[in-house]
Amino acid sequence: MKSVFLCEQADNISRVYAQSTVSLLKAEAALEAKVYTKRDLTKTPESFKETEYIFSSWGMPVLTADEISAYFPQLKCVFYAAGSVQSFARPFLERGIKVFSAWAANAVPVAEYTAAQIILANKGFFKAAQKMSGGDVPAAREAFNHYSGNYGAKVGIIGAGMIGKLVIQALKNHRLEILVSDPFLTDKTAGELCVKKCGLDELFRSCTVVSNHLANNGQTRGMLDYALFSSMPPYGVFINTGRGAQVVESGLARALERRPDLTALLDVTDPEPPESGSPFYSLENCILTPHIAGSSGNEVHRMAEYISDEFLRFKKGLPCRYEVTLKMLETMA
């Protein structure tokens, strides 16, 4: 067999790979429809000696370098129809096997979701809706009056990777002043994006809405703390669709308790979901969602389409767009 599906959760393969994509890969990559697991590798290791390409999605098993050498001596590439490859990619890359990810495809719905929240946040939607739904019409109107709308509002973007850039692009038709904190953002790219570079202190102090898109690694863990949250302007809104580990959650909870004017929109936490008894469940100014920003429903088909297109580009010797390198693992989510 030349290509195989390898995934611990077969349902994810059938959900992400539309039948049209599977048919294309059967024809172009000699892909077998069966979904194999790590257990299959150990039971019949000889079956994979000729495999050149692995296709996967959420549930890709973690393999050591020795296991990769033993099971897949002819392997050239892993095509991953999902976002982060941090959990499994390094041993493949260290053996010279190329890894491609649909991180760019998964970034699209996250950026759409975030941009929508930013627009609503600047209109005072979350505070006003909460008061209005509780039957307090005067309080709803009073809350709404504290927000200046989107015209000329300052929005802070933390991290200008793929998602951060897409959020900025999604907001380009609105007259917003966008500040970005990202040590890897060059002056040239900032100019092209029409954004202002700044540090975290200035960003939190200046922006009515702040959205986190930091890469998830040891360097960013606990980077967003009480001092930053408590410095936000009156009626500021913090949006997190990145990772919960980047937030000192006790500090955020304390800021929300002491500053009821603030609002936090948390699609991610650490742990996820929050533990029983977490103040996030009881704080009126904290809105939790169950990690819904990323690809869902029919949106997941986009990831497999990106990956199948990437395979065709590789096969034809064309430049590939979504290859992940060891260097990229240092800064990618």
What are these regions (language model features)?
Residues 102-154, 169:
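Phosphate-binding beta-alpha-beta segment of Rossmann-like dinucleotide-binding domains, i.e.
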